[in-house]
């Protein structure tokens, strides 16, 4: 995009107005012009366009101390919807949301242990069609979050580490059958987006760890994800223990949901967390300590300003998380000992809300592009 051309400038300013109303609520035309340093004719033109698109509505007269009362404008949050899909190892979740990310409809279907790409793909398409039929409001786009390797055009799964999926054009098929734009996004990117959109995360440098059935991590630097394809869950923390990857002593062998569940005859981590069995308690303490070891190494390498833990296993009772935090503080370099190590406020909703955030950004608000422009 040539930012210097008039049409591009109008496009950018339209997005700035839309994001202002989405983030901060009602404004008059004059307030928008002042806040974004736009001239009044340009502001009026942009507002008129947004009104015609149905993205913005006039709310009424603002309260003023004196003089003419201006008309306020607000985001028409129900004018468009997005559909976020989490293709998880145990469940596939679908969330239909408005422009503010409010959940209007949620559905969950079990993910088979080793799903057939064609069968499960068809189930996903049918559920997307069902979600599309229950509303008359336009769905701007569909985003599917997955831990798989994704093609450059974000339409196909190239390879999945845990399933026999190769070159599966999932998003392309969803788009063709639903007549709605669709893309794939890596789960780590979705979770980071969720923190920034829905948890108010404003740190420019932080490490995000997805501690769930499997373990992964991503470093965010200057609002950009680096190391999205890192293998955080396979950091060595022990000298024994065969991992599913074929390695020995990986973090996953001690702390991943699959490893903890296998150790106790398939019992879910949620149930294990409530157990008082000494063997279970010891296993969960070892998992917390192993995560502390991995975070100590990651912190020393990255120098991040914050560590955020997401995913299902991160919802262990507080005393296990406190044990992890204590281990980190005691063993990390003194200059890094005081950085926050916290659980995500979004708990186990991070991935599916992240798919919603990516959809909102891609098809409505384009905040990533605006952030990139600010850094030029």
Regions found by a protein language model. Give the residues of each.
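ATP-binding/phosphotransfer module of carbohydrate and carboxylate kinases, centering on a glycine-rich
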Residues: 1-61, 65-138, 178, 198-200, ...
């Amino acid at each position: 995009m040539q930012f210097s051309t008039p049409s591009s400038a109008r496009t950018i300013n339209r997005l700035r107005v839309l994001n202002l109303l989405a983030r901060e609520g009602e404004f008059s035309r004059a307030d928008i012009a002042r806040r974004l340093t736009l001239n009044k004719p340009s502001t009026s033109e942009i507002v008129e366009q947004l009104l015609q698109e149905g993205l913005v509505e006039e709310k009424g007269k603002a309260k003023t101390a004196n003089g003419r009362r201006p008309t306020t404008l607000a985001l028409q949050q129900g004018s468009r919807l997005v559909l976020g899909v989490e293709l998880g190892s145990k469940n596939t979740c679908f969330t239909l949301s408005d422009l503010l990310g409010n959940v209007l409809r949620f559905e969950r279907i079990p993910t088979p242990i080793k799903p057939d790409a064609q069968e499960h793909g068809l189930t996903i398409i049918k559920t997307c069609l069902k979600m599309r039929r229950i509303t008359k409001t336009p769905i701007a786009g569909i985003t599917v979050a997955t831990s798989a390797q994704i093609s450059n055009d974000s339409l196909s799964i190239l390879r999945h580490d845990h399933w026999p999926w190769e070159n599966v054009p999932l998003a392309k098929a969803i788009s063709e059958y639903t007549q709605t734009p669709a893309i794939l996004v890596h789960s780590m990117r979705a979770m980071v987006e969720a923190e920034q959109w829905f948890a108010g995360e404003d740190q420019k440098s932080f490490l995000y760890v997805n501690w769930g059935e499997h373990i992964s991590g991503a470093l965010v630097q200057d609002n950009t994800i680096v190391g999205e394809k890192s293998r955080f869950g396979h950091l060595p923390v022990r000298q024994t223990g065969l991992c599913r990857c074929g390695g020995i002593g990986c973090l996953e062998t001690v702390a991943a949901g699959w490893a903890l569940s296998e150790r106790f005859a398939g019992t879910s981590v949620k149930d294990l967390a409530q157990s008082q069995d000494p063997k279970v308690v010891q296993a969960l303490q070892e998992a917390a300590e192993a995560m502390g070891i991995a975070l100590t190494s990651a912190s020393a390498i990255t120098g991040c300003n914050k560590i955020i833990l997401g995913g299902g296993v991160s919802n262990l009772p507080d005393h296990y998380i406190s044990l992890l935090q204590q281990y980190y503080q005691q063993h990390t370099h003194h200059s890094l000992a005081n950085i926050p190590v916290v659980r995500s406020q979004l708990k186990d909703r991070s991935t599916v809300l992240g798919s919603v955030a990516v959809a909102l950004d891609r098809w409505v608000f384009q905040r990533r592009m605006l952030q990139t422009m600010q850094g030029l």
